[in-house]
Swiss-Prot record:
Name by which UniProt lists this protein: RNA demethylase ALKBH5
Record's keyword annotation contains DNA-binding: no
Subcellular locations according to the entry: Nucleus speckle
InterPro entries membership: AlkB-like, AlkB-like_sf, ALKBH5
Cofactors, names only: Fe(2+)
Coiled coil regions, renumbered to chain: 67-116
Main location: nucleus
Length: 394
């Protein structure tokens, strides 16, 4: 049998079979080692490029991913801007609970006197969910000017607003002087902003050509927040995320200067006024601040020659709009949506829409009286105090 299989004896056949088994085992071990090496290489590649799909070569390395890089850049810019804002802010808690209560009682007296009509016309400025009371110096802003925008604000003539109440000097200003927050004699303008829940003030910069720096404010009645770098949208009102949200506590003093006062807007958001809140803003007007040269305006219609009578050298001050009524708002006024300047502009534009785009609630008589040819200046009937609105071509 051994001869038929080609082996001379059984020992040679056993030796031959052992050699083949060793060869096969070695081949299997080599194949396993090779497979392990390939798997290790793939794992290393996946670790190096975690966002790459299998078998797809990345076009950009991770560090140069455009979307990721843009997001990180925006975050870095926001953090840098927040750092600049913080560099221009000082905060301190100076007023105790008892001191706050005394000052808040005085603020209530101001509100009561205003409701009785005991202040000058330009001392009080009313808006839904927010009233302002100017003392020492007052100025025109926002809807009060026909020509709007930064740099158009003007101080009222001397005497058009009431003097700073003595209690503001004794209870507020003197304490700030004692703690060296402001120097003696710095303040000549005090404004009290009185907010109801949901009230707000849109993003703005205190007029640089009107007021010196710093700007000092003291908070009363409740806690809130002062936000920097927000953008407002209206109908419904919405506010973007701030660059910095600064908590302001009852009895705290906030001092703005530098970048925080001049290079970025600040605002009070509606969601940050959960309870009644008041703030006393103390400032100093610039010696070269522009001022209206005429006496206070009444709510009557201005004569056509009014503008020519208000020349001061080569400068013409923009005419004031008639002031709002000083009647007390009805009880439901605080619960209606706040009417802001962008809303008013949209309402004016809606009057000028063609017939097929107007709502059916407008009568033909109203349409006849409020329809004009494009490009013309339009106003109400003679004798109306309404401001002229220039139509836009669409």
């Amino acid at each position: 049998m051994a001869a038929a299989s080609g082996y001379t004896d059984l020992r040679e056949k056993l030796k031959s079979m052992t050699s083949r088994d060793n060869y096969k085992a070695g081949s299997r071990e080599a194949a396993a080692a090779a497979a392990a090496a390939v798997a290790a290489a793939a794992a290393a590649a996946a670790a190096a490029e975690p966002y790459a799909a299998p078998g797809v070569k990345r076009k950009y390395p991770e560090d140069s991913d455009p979307e990721r890089s843009d997001f990180e850049e925006q975050q870095l810019q926001k953090e840098e801007e927040a750092r600049k804002v913080k560099s221009g802010i000082r905060q301190m808690r100076l007023f105790s609970q008892d001191e706050c209560a005394k000052i808040e009682a005085r603020i209530d007296e101001v509100v009561s006197r205003a409701e009785k009509g005991l202040y000058n016309e330009h001392t009080v400025d009313r808006a839904p969910l927010r009233n302002k009371y100017f003392f020492g110096e007052g100025y025109t802003y926002g809807a009060q000017l026909q020509k709007r925008g930064p740099g158009q604000e003007r101080l009222y003539p001397p005497g058009d607003v009431d003097e700073i109440p003595e209690w503001v000097h004794q209870l507020v200003i003197q304490k700030l002087v004692e703690h060296r927050v402001i120097p003696e004699g710095f303040v000549n303008s005090a404004v009290i902003n009185d907010y109801q829940p949901g009230g707000c003030i849109v993003s703005h910069v205190d007029p640089i050509h009107i007021f010196e720096r710093p700007i000092v404010s003291v908070s009363f009645f409740s806690d809130s927040a002062l936000c920097f770098g927000c953008k407002f949208q209206f109908k419904p009102i919405r506010v973007s995320e701030p660059v910095l949200s600064l908590p302001v506590r009852r009895g705290s003093v906030t001092v703005l200067s530098g970048y925080a006062a001049d290079e970025i807007t600040h605002c009070i958001r509606p969601q940050d006024i959960k309870e009644r809140r008041a703030v006393i803003i103390l400032r100093k007007t610039r010696l070269d601040a522009p001022r209206l040269e005429t006496k206070s305006l009444s709510s009557s219609v201005l004569p056509p020659s009014y503008a020519s009578d208000r020349l001061s050298g080569n400068n013409r001050d923009p005419a004031l709009k008639p002031k709002r009524s000083h009647r007390k708002a009805d009880p439901d006024a605080a619960h209606r949506p706040r009417i802001l300047e962008m809303d008013k502009e949209e309402n004016r534009r809606s009057v000028l829409l063609p017939a097929h785009r107007r709502a059916g609630r407008f009568s033909s008589e109203n349409y006849r009286r409020k329809s004009y040819e494009p490009g013309e200046d339009c106003s109400e009937a003679a004798g109306s105090p309404a401001r002229k609105v220039k139509m836009r071509r669409h």
